[in-house]
Amino acid sequence: MNAVSMTVIGAGSYGTALAIAFARNGHHVLLWGYNPQHVRELQIHRCNQAFLPDVQFPDNLSPEASLETAITASRNILIAVPSHVFHQVLYNIQPYLNQHSRIIWATKGLEHGTGRLLQEVAREILGDKIPLAIFSGPTFAKELAIGLPTAITVAASNAEFSEELQQLFHCDKSFRVYKNPDMIGVQLGGVIKNVIAIGAGISDGMGFGANARIALITRGLAEISRLGIAMGAELSTFMGMTGLGDLVLTCTDNQSRNRRFGILLGQGMDIEEAEKQIGQIVEGYLNTKEVRMLARRIGVEMPITEQIYHVLYSGKSVVEAANTLLSRTLKDEIHDKVCF
């Protein structure tokens, strides 16, 4: 078998889908999961019965239980784990990295407890010499895994790395890869859209209709853009795949856990029961606190995020939160050519 082109760390639905997509493109891929029993089941059944039971693994996708073997087998390490364990995963893989290693992640989140960008976390743990990149964009795991047409964006710490990843993983038949040099913007778009999607779900669960949903999406995009610009991101990034594209997808399609979680809250279900019914990690719930923390630290107003935070963490009712948003002081939509 050919040399390993990519090791994927994280055998959940999204990590598995990415591994399948890369393998389908002719690359030898290793897929590592933290649970040895789960990895053994992947090896036996040649599919991920827990998350993607109907999608068989290509022959060149190899589940791997040894973290050392997985990391040392390839220079390209793609991390696809929930954001709250991203920090620990980097610490775990760091001893096995070498001067040729390169780190990519598809995790959409901020560091738990600090609100830091994952780029900052990676630099702190891994140092300045290892190239870093992000895969982000409007993708649902199942559609990616079964080979439906999908587009994604890569942002990297240097142009050469970005170009190589684009060429490595682009597939004319189903998987289109765009480049974007704006690492900050690409990260923020992928994080905050999950928070806004909870709000869109709450609105739909309350029966507010399509008008309210699109208002939340539009003003949510304004919040993402405000914070991004304040942190040095490019406005154009938020008009692209990792901004507007990912936001619209996550706010409007019921494959989104964040949207479904919000719908349940809007229908009156409590948070614990809604989490249980979703059955998988809801990144927007985990990251609302961190996004609010980051916005307050930077000094950026994010009223939708603020109200979602109070619903999730302060016991505010969804009705009260909606009334608070609707009764805010009237203002201009456009300021300095930006939708603020």
From Swiss-Prot:
| A single BP term in Gene Ontology | glycerol-3-phosphate catabolic process
* HAMAP family reported for this sequence: NAD_Glyc3P_dehydrog
Q: What is its EC number?
A: 1.1.1.94
| Family label | Belongs to the NAD-dependent glycerol-3-phosphate dehydrogenase family.
Pfam families attached to this UniProt entry:
NAD_Gly3P_dh_C, NAD_Gly3P_dh_N
Query: What are the record's GO terms for cellular component?
Result: cytosol
* Catalysed reactions listed for this entry: sn-glycerol 3-phosphate + NAD(+) = dihydroxyacetone phosphate + NADH + H(+); sn-glycerol 3-phosphate + NADP(+) = dihydroxyacetone phosphate + NADPH + H(+)
Task: State the protein's purpose.
Answer: Catalyzes the reduction of the glycolytic intermediate dihydroxyacetone phosphate (DHAP) to sn-glycerol 3-phosphate (G3P), the key precursor for phospholipid synthesis.
Can you name one GO molecular function term for this protein? Answer: NAD binding
What is the name of this protein? Answer: Glycerol-3-phosphate dehydrogenase [NAD(P)+]
Protein's organism: Bartonella quintana (strain Toulouse)
Class of the enzyme per the UniProt entry, highest EC level:
oxidoreductase
Listed binding positions for sn-glycerol 3-phosphate are K108, G137, T139, K193, D246, S256, R257, N258
Q: Which domain of life is it from?
A: Bacteria
